[in-house]
Amino acid sequence: AGSSSGNVTIDNITISGSMSFDKMGENIGGILGYANNGVQKITNITTNLSINGANTKVGGVVGYVENSTFECSQFTVNTNQFAINGNSYIGAIAGKTYNSGFSISDVSINHIMTEQDKDVLVIYATNQFVGGIIGCAEQCKESSLSNVLVRTSVGSSGTGSDSDTGKYVGGLIGYCNTSNKIDICDTKISSQ
């Protein structure tokens, strides 16, 4: 779906294939590009999706979540084909959330890096705001991350034209702006 407004429930889905862009496109997600004003509940996802060369707000599940509660559980990656990359606001699950809360649990991103591809960036931005789970959580409401494994490379190539290029990179969340509580438990981040 390109976008949703209101409540959405999606269960038991497999995402495969690839999407390629030439430094254009925004609000791009494996399931939803843009989600607004509701509760989005997406569960039991297996993916080997590859999104390459998009501009901004790119996620393996949803590109941009606004004014919502986003729930994602049982998200599994067990293939070296998985890759999410673009210019800015890049995340394995969500590129950007704004004025939203999230509950993300039971995530396994297991893209094992071999010696041969040790320099490959799997979840990356050419500019900024990139996270293993969410690229940017702005004005974040109370949220949680639990039972999360991110075993892959996350980074920025720092080749963007923005003066802040290469900033805001995180194993879980690239950038988070909130005065609310975010519970994080049982998480593991590794590049190997």
What are these regions (language model features)?
Residues 1-192:
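Surface-exposed loop/turn motifs in large extracellular/passenger domains
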